[in-house]
Curated annotation (Swiss-Prot):
Record-given protein name: Elongation factor Tu
GO molecular function terms attached to this record: GTP binding; GTPase activity; translation elongation factor activity
Xref: NCBIfam families: EF-Tu, PRK00049.1, PRK12735.1, PRK12736.1, small_GTP
UniProt region (G5), positions on chain: 174-176
Organism in which the protein naturally occurs: Methylacidiphilum infernorum (isolate V4)
Length: 394
């Protein structure tokens, strides 16, 4: 029992497999669990256990995702694998599975294919910070020069999309052979895990980031003043600290004179806490749902941005028809809807349900915004799309 408690001390990292259909993403995921299970660091997961991923809902969108856990000597990994290409797009855009790093699987027999490109581009757009490459099926390639060519091609492709292609670790192997227990190929799986350990840094924990709390409700407490409530998204806050209220209206500064949780006073609020903050000198009408309380100078309001968006199919509860330039839905950021106008890219006539598309949005009021932030697109309270901010314009 004591051993179990000790294991939880390892730092936690979220990863996932990406790459073209049939290049071996799920086989690799399974192989990692098989090889690490021999060292007592994972539970074996067979290919079909992973492939029959259960459906999940994220922001009103149904996604099939398999979640696998394993450990290296240094770390604890949560690994996501999606059966279908559309699931990947939805997963990456909604941030259902936020990745600290991705394992790009490329078949050595085929080289990079269209979805290889699409997944690298998506990783860049949604802010996946690190990629390691597993060059799979090398047992099917006899020609060493051909292998080198494929490796060069992959590095070139990564460079094209703004990843450091020359520095990224590329591990060659065969997931299937490793699954079959071939010791030579099992070694490659351990090399891959080692590359992940060394190349993907441990992310900064939400607690260590600058304080931010989206406002969900505003109350007036007789004789005390205005209280805003919400769930702390990141960072920590102490009583009597100065904060900014950002978004929708001009930014204002105030001091948090009291922090309450479950009707008790707290000295410090931290990421994950549901709290009420008493704000000095702020009237109930000065603040509203949709604004954020943040550490001064750490987040700014914006109204114009580029986004990568997945538009729901009719079967997913989305629109039944295409939309055109000038489309004006609601954009749901954190806790509130803001109306915005869509400008499609040059040469794009319309957007169909089921499309994965990039366009510009101009909101009618500014929102506290950061690159890689997620949002939903809604019409009359119904989700019709999911998006991520790829670039802030103004």
């Amino acid at each position: 029992m004591a051993k179990e408690a000790f294991l939880r001390k390892k730092p936690h990292i979220n990863v996932g497999t990406i790459g073209h259909v049939d290049h071996g993403k799920t086989t690799l995921t399974s192989a990692i669990t098989y090889v690490l299970a021999k060292k007592g660091l994972a539970q074996k997961m067979a290919y079909d256990q992973i492939d029959k991923a259960p459906e999940e809902k994220e922001r009103g969108i149904t996604i099939n995702t398999a979640h696998v856990e394993y450990e290296s000597d240094k770390r604890h990994y949560a690994h996501v694998d999606c059966p279908g290409h559309a699931d990947y797009i939805k997963n990456m855009i909604t941030g259902a599975a936020q990745m600290d790093g991705a394992i790009l699987v490329v078949s050595a027999a085929d080289g990079p294919m269209p979805q290889t490109r699409e997944h690298i581009l998506l990783a860049r757009q949604v802010g996946v910070p690190y990629i390691v490459v597993f060059l799979n099926k090398v047992d099917m390639v006899d020609d060493k020069e051909l292998l080198e060519l494929v490796e060069l091609e992959v590095r070139e492709l990564l460079n094209q999309y703004g990843f450091p292609g020359d520095k990224i670790p590329i591990i060659k192997g065969s997931a299937l052979k490793a699954l079959e227990g071939d010791p030579e190929y099992e070694k490659n799986i351990l090399e891959l895990v080692e590359a992940m350990d060394n190349y993907i840094p441990i992310p900064e924990r939400p607690k260590d980031q600058p304080f931010l709390m989206p406002i969900e409700d505003v109350f007036n407490i007789e004789g005390r003043g205005t209280v805003v409530t919400g769930r702390v998204e990141r960072g920590t806050l102490k009583r009597m600290e100065e904060v900014e209220i950002v978004g929708i209206r001009p930014t204002t500064k105030t001091v948090v004179t009291d922090i309450e949780m479950f009707r008790k006073t707290l000295d410090t609020a931290e990421a994950g806490d549901n709290v009420g903050l008493l704000l000095r000198g702020i009237k109930k009408d000065d603040v509203e749902r949709g604004q954020v309380v943040a550490k001064p100078g750490t987040i700014t309001p914006h109204h114009k941005f580029n986004a990568q968006v997945y538009v729901l199919k009719k079967e997913e509860g989305g629109r039944h028809t295409a939309f055109f330039n000038g489309y004006r839905p609601q954009f749901f950021f954190r806790t509130t809807d803001v109306t915005g106008t869509v400008t499609l890219k040059e040469g794009v006539e319309m957007v169909m349900p089921g499309d994965n598309v990039e366009f510009m949005v101009e909101l009618i009021s500014p929102i506290a915004m950061e690159k890689s932030m997620r949002f939903a697109i809604r019409e009359g309270g119904k989700t019709v799309g999911a998006g991520v901010v790829t670039e802030i314009i103004e």
